[in-house]
């Protein structure tokens, strides 16, 4: 807080871990990691692209192709909870500096996140520490394709994976008030499986 305004927020994520490295998919090699969801990561240069708005249509097409090819494979299976299985998104990145990357996260049906994506940043942290690109105590910076920034670092580990903290800017978006009518038979939600 500064002058009564929130400057940034941070969250501690679920254990993050490397799923696989060097997986051939859609004509390139990707690394796959989990950080709350499973993501495929590749350098934008592997497609002859950069993480810039001008290349966004090609990045989206490449991300969707990767997701389609990997979906349903053993790589996309969460090792402990099948409900968490599936390639949630693909992330293309480019190195800006030793502890600084520019990323774009493509998810769902070709949607692009305005942020570097918290769960993807946590997964990327696991990959970077695993390959020695960053040290266990380093904080690294992820910029999104539109310039929003996260800072991430490892804060510990468990048998399930690396514990990470992701910090970014925050802006008030509104006030929300929810009501629960006691007569609503589905007011507390439902699950169909």
Annotate each language-model stretch with its function.
Residues 1-193:
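Active-site proximal loop and beta-alpha junction motif in alpha/beta enzyme cores
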């Amino acid at each position: 807080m500064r002058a009564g305004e929130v400057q940034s927020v941070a969250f501690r994520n679920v254990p993050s871990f490397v799923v696989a490295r060097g997986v051939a998919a859609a004509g390139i090699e990707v690394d796959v990691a989990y950080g709350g969801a499973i993501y495929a990561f590749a350098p934008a240069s592997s497609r002859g692209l950069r993480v810039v708005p001008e290349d966004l249509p090609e990045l989206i097409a490449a991300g969707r192709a990767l997701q389609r090819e990997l979906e349903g494979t053993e790589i996309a299976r969460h090792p402990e909870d099948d409900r968490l299985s599936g390639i949630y998104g693909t992330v293309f990145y480019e190195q800006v500096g030793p502890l600084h990357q520019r990323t774009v996260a493509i998810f769902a049906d070709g949607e692009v996140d305005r942020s570097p994506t918290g769960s993807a940043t946590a997964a990327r942290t696991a990959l970077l520490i695993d390959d020695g690109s960053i040290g266990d105590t380093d904080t690294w910076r992820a910029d999104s394709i539109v310039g929003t920034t996260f800072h991430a670092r490892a804060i510990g580990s468990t048998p399930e994976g690396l514990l990470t903290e992701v910090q970014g800017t925050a802006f008030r978006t509104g006030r929300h008030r929810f009501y629960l009518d006691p007569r609503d038979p589905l007011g507390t939600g439902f699950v169909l499986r």
